[in-house]
Swiss-Prot record:
Disulfide pairings: 47-61, 54-66, 60-70, 65-77
Domain-level remarks: The cysteine framework is XI (C-C-CC-CC-C-C).
Species name: Californiconus californicus (California cone)
Protein's UniProt keywords contain Disulfide bond: yes
Chief site of localization: secreted
Propeptide: 20-33
Tissue and organ distribution: Expressed by the venom duct.
Alphabetical list of InterPro entries matching this protein: Conotoxin
Similarity comment: Belongs to the conotoxin I1 superfamily.
Protein name: Conotoxin Cl11.1
Length: 78
C-alpha cells in the first residue's frame, strides 16, 4: 500500500518539475532572441553609418562588418 501511495505521489509531482524546466527553457530562448535582435539592430545602425559614407559605391559590402545586411537592404554585391 505504501509503495502504491509513493508511486502515485511521484506521478503527481513529476509534471510539476518538468513543467518548470520547460518554462525555464522558453525564457532562455526568449532572452536569446532578444539579445539577437539587439545585436542585429546594432549591425543595422553600423551599416547605415557606413552606407552614408560610401554612398552608392559598392565598398559598403566589402569594407564593413555588415555585408549580409547591406546586400539584403540595398543592392547585390558582385
Amino acid at each position: 500500500m505504501k509503495l502504491a501511495l509513493t508511486f502515485l505521489l511521484i506521478l503527481m509531482i513529476l509534471p510539476l518539475t518538468t513543467g518548470g524546466k520547460k518554462s525555464d527553457n522558453q525564457a532562455l530562448k526568449r532572452l536569446g532572441a532578444r539579445k539577437f535582435n539587439e545585436n542585429l539592430s546594432e549591425l543595422n545602425s553600423a551599416c547605415d553609418d557606413a552606407w552614408e559614407t560610401c554612398a552608392w559605391s559598392r565598398t559598403c559590402c566589402s569594407r564593413n562588418c555588415c555585408r549580409g545586411i547591406c546586400v539584403s537592404r540595398y543592392y547585390e554585391c558582385p
